Every structure is written in structure tokens, then in C-alpha cells.
Design a protein with these regions (language model features):
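Conserved N-terminal helical subregion
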Residues: 12, 17-18, 70, 74, ...
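Glycine-rich FAD cofactor-binding loop and adjacent beta-loop-alpha segment at the N-terminus
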Residues: 12, 19-23, 27-88
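Hydrophobic "anchor" residues on beta-strands that sit immediately upstream
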Residues: 22, 45, 145-147, 291
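Active-site flanking residues adjacent to catalytic metal/cofactor-binding acidic residues
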Residues: 25, 48, 150, 294-295, ...
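Conserved FAD-binding catalytic core of PHBH/FMO-like flavoproteins
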Residues: 72, 145-267, 274
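FAD/FMN-dependent oxidoreductases across multiple families
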Residues: 232-332
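C-terminal helical "tail/cap" subdomain of flavin- and related membrane-associated enzymes
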Residues: 320-401
Length: 401
């Protein structure tokens, strides 16, 4: 056995009472959720948890739909307010007068989705894992019939297994932070498709700016995700907190009044990516298999706010496939795992195409494209059944419901 194979098939950790059925590599939100779901099926789980690489402030907040909320509530891991903020309405502004409004009341409900503080959610999941006797948290990989890789888009295990990761880089980086606003957000998520001047470029470049409500009902705090051209990043990151808030206020037309930064700024490149395959045999054996889930399998533009929803849908589908397996079929069976791969690849590809198409549509310069997309927004906002169908899809509801 060579070194790579030895790494892939790490020996059983004697600290565990009995050999695990499944090893999960990655103890983020997706990995811990999967571990808790599998433990309820009376499966023995080894959860590989390694210290995070960064120690800076965590400004992440995720938009979660109804399906994800019900999943986490069922695990008793749904955070309390103000760590969870219901979104009652979403407003999307085009670059030349177009506007879309999505309202929860139009769907006969009180929330479109929820904004959730990542550190609080991670803490709830970690606490639940500690109280689950079927889960053993381990510092290094453990050999098991099935290994599920939930290490994120930079997964080292995926690379070691030789699984391709097809990446299309956008000419955009995301700048994220949190702000205190003069006016309350009112439970409204706001997004602008706009343009920003880039150093060294004669033409302005497409940008997407989102202000997402935080701090519970009636809160004055928002999460910012500002997708800008990479050449504009040094300028925006180099501004003082006051000057950054001022430039941001101009870009969003002072929608929430005066704003002040309440956290450090973070930045990362945006990309569309997907793994060439989601399942396979571990090296050197046909008795152990792997499956990818979450960002280890895919990445998409954040403009639709579906990243974590898609990752949680991965783990829910994998658990469903395991629940429905024939009693004689082992967890590493390729036909079993192919059911999971087929189900998730199609949905993820569809969502990726939608977000990629929207990003590219609003990145096209010129008055013809500008008029086309803004008239399209106007028409879609009045489309009735089509708009309702799209809204229910984003909410994680059955379109026929």
C-alpha cells in the first residue's frame, strides 16, 4: 500500500467503541447535519473535525429556505432569535428601473426564508453532536465502508482521490461584512444589479449588491455581500470604515439611511464549479467507497442565496437513499450510491445554470441588453403563475403545493 492509499484508508481509531459505518470528513454545517441524521438511523459515525485555518471574525450569514429550516428544527438545532431573522419580502432592483418584489404573503405564508448567523448555528450543531452516542468526533480519518467528503470547495481529500473539479471563475470577488443601519430593515432582503468603475477600465463593470436582514424582527443590522470586479477590490478594502460605508450608501441609494460597519470586511473569489463525479471506490479496495456533499461537490454564485440550501439538500438525499436501501446491500455499493449521484447532480446543475445565467445576463454591457433585462424584470414581476412557481422553488416548497 502506497502513502496515498494509506492516507485514504486510515486505520480504525481505537478510541471508538466499535468500527464506524460511515466516516464524514469535514465538521462544518453540512458535515454535522449529516452526522446527526445518520445517527438517528442507528449508524455509527466517525466525524473528522480539524481546527479551522483562520481565526478572524466570522461575518457569515446564510439564507435558509423552508426545507432547510424544517430539517434543522427536526434535529432541534434551529437557533433562536436574534440569531435567526425571518425574511418577509425580497426586493431586486435592476440597473435601469427594473424591479422585482417577492412577498411571503403572496404565497400564503409569513416568511420567504430566514437569515441565520453561522457561528450560532455551528454551535448548536456541535452541541447536538456531543450528546449523540452514535457519533465519535475524531481528529483524523477512519476507515469505514462509506466516507462522505464535506470539506468544502477546497477539499484536499477530493484532490487526493483524483476527482476533477471543473471551475469557471467569475470576474467578481465577494466582499462581505456587517453594518448597523439608521433605519430598521423591516425583514426585507434587498439586492441591486448595478455598475462600478474599475481602475484601468474605461467601461464600468457589473456588480451585485445585497443587504440581508439580521438581528431578528425589527433589527437594524444587515449582512452585506457585494460582488465586484477583482480590480476594484483593493480600492474598496483599502477604504476606511467610514469611507467604505459612504461609498456603499451611494451604491444602494441610502435605502436604510446612514450605515456604519460593525465587523471586519472579508473577501473571496466567486466561481461556478462542480465535481466530475460524486461517488467512487476508495483507493486500493472495493469494500470502501466515497461520496461528495456540499461545497466539496459544487459551488455557485451567491446571488440567489442557495449555497447552503443545496448542500443540506445533498445530505437529506443521501440519508433518504440509505434509508431506502435493500437490507442486503452494503453502504459502499456503487448502485446504491449512484442513486444519490443521479438525484443530486441534476438538481445542482439546474440551480447552477440559473445563477450563472442571471449573473451573465446582468453583466452584459450596452443599452440593448440593459433595456432587455429591465423589461424582462418588469414582465416577470407581473407574470403571476411563473413568478409564484419560481418563488416556491426558492422557498423549498413543492411547486404544485
Amino acid at each position: 500500500m502506497n502513502n496515498a492509499q494509506r492516507t485514504m484508508t486510515a486505520t480504525y481509531n481505537a478510541a471508538m467503541a466499535s468500527p464506524p459505518d460511515i466516516c464524514i470528513r469535514g465538521a462544518g454545517i453540512v458535515g454535522r447535519t449529516l452526522a446527526l441524521l445518520l445517527a438517528r438511523e442507528r449508524l455509527r459515525v466517525a466525524l473528522v473535525d480539524t481546527p479551522p485555518q483562520t481565526t478572524g471574525p466570522d461575518v457569515r450569514a446564510y439564507s435558509l429556505n423552508g426545507t432547510a429550516q424544517r430539517l434543522l428544527q427536526d434535529l432541534r438545532c434551529w437557533p433562536d432569535s436574534p440569531a435567526v431573522t425571518p425574511v418577509h419580502q425580497m426586493q431586486v432592483f435592476g440597473d435601469h428601473g427594473g424591479i422585482l418584489t417577492f412577498g411571503a404573503q403572496d404565497q400564503g405564508t409569513s416568511e420567504l426564508n430566514w437569515m441565520v448567523d453561522v457561528p450560532v448555528l455551528e454551535a448548536r450543531l456541535a452541541a447536538a453532536v456531543q450528546f449523540q452516542p452514535q457519533i465519535e468526533v475524531v481528529p483524523s480519518p477512519v476507515a469505514a465502508p462509506l466516507t462522505v467528503i464535506c470539506e468544502g470547495r477546497a477539499s484536499q481529500t477530493r484532490a487526493e482521490l483524483g476527482v476533477g473539479f471543473d471551475i469557471t471563475a467569475y470576474e467578481q470577488h465577494a466582499i462581505a461584512t456587517r453594518l448597523r443601519c439608521e433605519r430598521p430593515h423591516g425583514g426585507v432582503a434587498r439586492q441591486w444589479f448595478t455598475w462600478g468603475q474599475v481602475p484601468g477600465r474605461s467601461e464600468a463593470q457589473a456588480e451585485i449588491l445585497a443587504l440581508l436582514p439580521l438581528g431578528g424582527e425589527g433589527g437594524h443590522e444587515v449582512a452585506l455581500v457585494w460582488s465586484v470586479h477583482p480590480l476594484r477590490v483593493p480600492h474598496l478594502m483599502g477604504l476606511s470604515a467610514e469611507d467604505f460605508a459612504s461609498e456603499l450608501g451611494q451604491a444602494c441609494h441610502m435605502a436604510l439611511g446612514h450605515m456604519t460597519l460593525s465587523a471586519e470586511r472579508a473577501v473571496w473569489p466567486l466561481q461556478l464549479a462542480r465535481a466530475s463525479r460524486w461517488i467512487g471506490d476508495m483507493p486500493g479496495t472495493t469494500k470502501q467507497a466515497f461520496a461528495l456533499a456540499g461545497d466539496a461537490a459544487h459551488a455557485m454564485h451567491p446571488l440567489a442565496g442557495q449555497g447552503l440550501n443545496v448542500g443540506l439538500a445533498d445530505v437529506a438525499e443521501l440519508v433518504r437513499v440509505i434509508q431506502a436501501k435493500e437490507f442486503w446491500r452494503p453502504l459502499h455499493d456503487s448502485k446504491l450510491l449512484r442513486r444519490y449521484e443521479r438525484a443530486r447532480q441534476a438538481d445542482v446543475q439546474a440551480m447552477g445554470l440559473v445563477t450563472d445565467g442571471l449573473q451573465r445576463l446582468f453583466a452584459q454591457p450596452g443599452p440593448v441588453w440593459q433595456n432587455l433585462r429591465n423589461w424582462g424584470m418588469w414582465g416577470f414581476d407581473r407574470s403571476g403563475p411563473l413568478k409564484n412557481w419560481m418563488t416556491r422553488q426558492a422557498m423549498g416548497q413543492d411547486a404544485a403545493a
